[in-house]
Structure formats: C-alpha cells, structure tokens
Swiss-Prot record:
It is found in: Cytoplasm. This is Glycerol-3-phosphate dehydrogenase [NAD(+)] At3g07690, cytosolic. GO terms for cellular component: cytoplasm. It is an enzyme of class 1 (oxidoreductase). InterPro entries: 6-PGluconate_DH-like_C_sf (IPR008927), 6PGD_dom2 (IPR013328), G3P_DH_NAD-dep (IPR006168), G3P_DH_NAD-dep_C (IPR006109), G3P_DH_NAD-dep_N (IPR011128), NAD(P)-bd_dom_sf (IPR036291). Homodimer. One of its GO terms (molecular function) is NAD binding. It catalyses: sn-glycerol 3-phosphate + NAD(+) = dihydroxyacetone phosphate + NADH + H(+).
Amino acid sequence: MMDHLVETNSVPSRLVEERLDEIRRVMGKADDDPLRIVGVGAGAWGSVFIAMLQENYGKFRGKVSVRIWRRGGRAIDKATAEHLFEVINSREELLRRLIRRCAYLKYVEARLGDRVLYADEILKDGFCLNMIETPLCPLKVVTNLQEAVWDADIVINGLPSTETFQVFNEISKYWKERVNAPVIISLAKGVEAEFEPHPRIVTPTQMIHRATGIPLENILYLGGPNIASEVYNKEYANARICGSEKWRKPLGKFLRQSHFIVWDNSDLITHEVMGGLKNVYAIGAGMVATLTKESATSKSVYFAHCTSEMIFITHLLAKEPEKLAGPLLADTYVTLLKGRNAWYGQKLAKGELSLEMGDSIKGKGMIQGVSAVKAFFELLNQSSLSLQHPEEGKPVTPAELCPILKMLYRILITREFSCEAILEALRDETMNDPRELIEIAHSHLFFQPWLLGQKP
C-alpha cells in the first residue's frame, strides 16, 4: 500500500488559514459556524495533540474552537505540586505567562500546602498531569462531557483502550439528535479481547463504532513513532492517519505541521493492532534493557524475536497486513526504546515499581501494555484456535508459538515468574529462528478472520 506524503514546508499564517478553510469546506461549515475540535481524554499524547492544534489554529477564533475534556476532581498531591512549582520557576517565559494570567499565586499556595490543585485546573494553564516537565500552551478545558462533545465536528480520542468504550457509550447519549455524524480520530494504542459468542480482538475504533453507531468511515486511527513531549518540543516527527479515503486525505493535510509529517494509509486494522502489540513487547524490552545493563546484543536479540511474533499475530488477523517496515517499524522501535511501557518494564526490573501498584502510574498514566498482554495471550491461547503445527504435526494454539508473549503473560498477569524470567525465555536453546515464525505467518495457515469480526 502506498503512503501519500503531505507537504512539509514551514507554513506561513496565510497558508495555515487556507488549510483551515479547506477542512471547513470539506465538513460543510457555514461562514458563521466555527469548526469545533474536541479532545476526549487528557493523557500525554492526547493533551499534546490538542495543544498542537490550538497553537496552529487557535488564533482563527471565528473559524475554529479547540477544547479538551478530562474528568474533574482529580487532586494533585503535595509532592507533585512542589515539582510543578520548580518547573514553573525554572522557566522565565512560563513564569511571566502565569503572572499575566493571574495564575501564579495558586501554585505558590499549593507549594506551601495552603491549597489543593486539580488536574483540570492546571491543564487550563498548560500542565498535563502525566507530563509536568513539558508545559503546553493554555487550553480550554471542559469537565462536563455533554458540554464538551454534543456539538463537536472532530473528536480526538485520547483515552486508553480500557476506557474508550465506556466513555463513548456515554457520549452516544448526547449525539442521538445529531443530523451529521462527527469525524473521530483515535490515538488509542491498545486492544481488548472478548470471548463470546466467539474469541475476537476489539480495537478502539471498533469500540467507538459499537458504542456510538458512528459509521466506520468516520472513525480513523492516527499513530506513529512519536514521544509526546518530543513532538511538542518540535522534534521532527511523522505519523500515519488510517481509515477511509474520504476523511484521511483532507485530515492528513489539516493535521500536518512543519515538524509533524502526516501520511495517509488505508490499512487501519494493522496499524491499530500494531499500536497495541508494540506496547506489549515494549514492557519486555524495558526489562531486558535493565537486566542486561543495556546490552545492545541482548536488546537486538529480543527485537528480532518480538517483531517476528508481531508479524505472526498480525497475519492471524489480516490476510495481507501492512508490512512491519517504514513508519510501522519505526513506531515499534521508538516505543521499545523510550515509551512509557518500556519505562514501566525498566522500573519493574529494577524493583522500583511492583505489580501490586497496578497499571495506572502517577505521573505516567495508564500502562496500556499490561491489559494488551492479557488480551492478546488469552485470545490466542483459546483451544478453539488450535491448528496443526506445520513441522511438528501436533495441535498448537497460536499463543504457544509466541514464547515472548507467553512469558510476559506469566510475569505480568499470572505472576508465576519474576522479571528475570524474560531472559530465560530469550535464551531458551529450543527457541526457533524468528524467520521460521515469519514463514508460518506468510503461509496464512493460521489466518482466522473472525478474530476481528470478519467473515471467513
């Protein structure tokens, strides 16, 4: 499949406005009706994504409105307030901005313990709770979900996969009277599994479709090799927006900036599934890096085995999935190198975090790889999926052919083993050459389209 490059030159204000006018025209907006863009969920990437849109288009107030929803009532502890105060005072421009907005005093009071700050309150000033050290531009924050989304034209899903269905099911109540369906761009990198009436993977875009009834052509996925803080700091980055041609092409042009390159691609499923899989294997990558003292050799061996398992799993779900190359491979690489899931694996291996602490970590947010490990392994270990092994001639489940996934499940979910066991799995002398698993994948022997709700 060909990716279509969106032009990347630095864009003058006049051309930015022209791009805004173009997407308004595509969406059928009247001259006196602003384009309403709403972020749902305020994790690091969701907040950065909305902040970039606000910085790029927010100055055209009569033509566009950008806002973000997050739950209210999340109090910030004193240690975080102290750290936030240090960040503010270390940056003169930020300090001046808060003073101009008459917002500095509350941070002084919170530092002294004289008042409590809330996550939605500091987000208005540009501070994402999961990314305190990377201040964003000020944002319009709404804590009432109905107020946030009822008239939205473009919705950015920044929720974890574990919360997507629940929140969009609530949103569906506010869209019943709508004439025109909104366009939804999901940033969620995770999957869930269900087992009745038959085993299947459910991706975030499918959850949104189920919850809201919004046509699938109006639901897209955007992902790429991006670390949220680096993207906001204008490190050169790229992404793919995947879905129907009707929307991915105009939205690709609308979303691009001089430092943020957007390609469009039709293969939504592979990119979305890979978005979940890379988080799975990133946890193991963090463990391996720590346990081997950053051994390049060990990390490369792990990379070879985990990417072969990823290729195998995507070929279970799609007959001709996008190849693990280019941006897809780069996305996997950066997530294994520096994503929050890799960080989580490192902290577990160092003993600085424990599984008893759960998968929602202060200052980092939801570690989506944990639920994805459970979803993928339990789905692929169903006896109903067993097939004859092409070489050994005995029935095996797909999970049995994925030893890294299996060991991550036994470390993170059933807790049978400590983190050190990931090295035992990696160094197992009976482990096959990764090429063999890739050849099995390309044989389509295990292709089972119903795993994604498709007809055989």
